[in-house]
């Protein structure tokens, strides 16, 4: 997608602080963190929202969760815990229409 912020980050057109990258997934620090540790984990394949995930994408989504697991261990946040959030659509607060998962950690998070 030409105008997608995350697609531009994937292509290297916009800089990011990468935490993890492979052929299918990119994880980077959020530029407006809401927690001391705030990582965005995204597929390199452009999928607008969770509602557009297909059966074909199921392995990719599973791999994203395994990547979240790895990042948590790499950052040492697996012991104290962390939150994973995926917003779906504008009314939920999704600002970038490219599926992404927020990893939030580094402090005790309030229940939502």
What are these regions (language model features)?
Residues 1-112:
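HIT superfamily nucleotide-processing domains
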